[in-house]
Amino acid sequence: MNSINIAIDGPASSGKSTVAKIIAKNLNYTYLDTGAMYRCATYLALQHGYEAQDVSKILGLLAERPISFGKAEDGSQTVFIGTEEVTLAIRQNDVTNNVSWVSAIPEIREELVNQQRRIAKDGAIIMDGRDIGTVVLPDAELKIFLVASVDERAERRFKENQEKGIESDFETLKSEIAARDYKDSHREVSPLKAAEDAIEFDTTGVSIEGVVTFIQEKAEKIIDMKN
């Protein structure tokens, strides 16, 4: 059976990761969490007190301690930097609030994009991020761009944090998400934008199941056409 690559892009907390993981499981595809890779680079930078001018040092750490993915007993994805599991550590607020400047560094993006492309070359990959359809996998057979209101996205992040035992304030999350949107869409390197051939879908008020069904039907149609 012929497989395809699926690119899902969109702003922070638009539901990309949740949806991508479910579709990957349903189609028996590999889910590649690109956002987690940038969070790993950010986590390393913060751990060592590195700033934007310390690019070569951050790249050195990424080379010494490569990022990899595993599976927990319940089937959920785990993230490692070298041998250290960082699945929860990279979701802390300090990492979230610093990931934009790290991911805007051209050399770091280039290194991680090369890793992502190598993984995707055999197909059957679902990737989500902010520039998958435009930069990482411009030849992906299916490109989706998810959007949702700031209020809805803040609510999702708030619930997510509660479930993980991370303390957060709803109004603070709203302003952080709005600021993140601005930074992501105005950065010089790979700004957040939909690919010209992407299908845009507003998930405000739409259930996760509804979004999954919408994307999976599109994917299955393309897969059928290839067979």
UniProtKB/Swiss-Prot annotation:
Q: What is its main location?
A: cytoplasm
Q: Which Pfam families match?
A: Cytidylate_kin (PF02224)
UniProt keyword annotation of Magnesium present:
no
Residue positions annotated to bind ATP are G10, P11, A12, S13, S14, G15, K16, S17, T18
Give an example GO molecular function.
CMP kinase activity
Q: Which UniProt keywords apply?
A: ATP-binding, Cytoplasm, Kinase, Nucleotide-binding, Transferase
State its Enzyme Commission number(s): 2.7.4.25
Is Cytoplasm a UniProt keyword of this protein?
Answer: yes
Which locations, inside or outside the cell, does it occupy?
Cytoplasm
InterPro entries listed in its UniProt record: Cytidylate_kin, Cytidylate_kinase_dom, P-loop_NTPase
The biological process GO terms on file are: nucleobase-containing small molecule interconversion; pyrimidine nucleotide metabolic process
Chemical reaction(s) catalysed = CMP + ATP = CDP + ADP; dCMP + ATP = dCDP + ADP
What family name appears in the similarity comment?
Belongs to the cytidylate kinase family. Type 1 subfamily.
Task: Write the protein's name.
Answer: Cytidylate kinase
